[in-house]
Amino acid sequence: RQRQMCIRDSCTGAGDDNLDIDWGYQGKLQFVIVKQSSDAGDHIVESDNTNADASVGYLTEPRSQPIISNFTFISNGKDDVIKLKEGVSGIYTNGIVIDASNSKACIETTKAETFQDAATTPKVTFNSVAFDCKALAVLGDDAGTLAQAEALITTGSNNLYSTDSGGGSYVPTVTGFINGTAERAMTVAD
């Protein structure tokens, strides 16, 4: 199966989710900038497998597996930055996840199938991603444990975490959506 690829995507001012992924989407997005306006927008990414349709089974194939690389996600705090649900897979590489209001989590997970997926291949992975939000992860409906949610994120390599987002020492130096010294010093993943 060939993956569709989107290169150089920017989203601003969306009234709902900026990247709404579901029903088996397996494309690649590279060089993505999302900076939400202060008065609109939900999640920057809402990624699910079968769009809340339990009648067909959340782990139905093909499972959604977006591959998103070289991205900057700056949230306005209306909702958690990335929502993973219903058995979704996904690969997030070389990115920044910031809640500018410091009032929401970087990742929200819902449905137990999201964690069942973590034990299968492909799974959700984050590599070389900087996180700065009020919390690293929160749980939505029927979502397992907070430790499971955080493990989806922290099992990756070369990630940076702020004090609130995983107990690290990362302090964002982003200006607008341009990387600063802290972001340019990150280890880059292939």
Task: Give the residues covered by each predicted segment.
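Extracellular beta-rich repeat passengers
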Residues: 1-4, 8-190
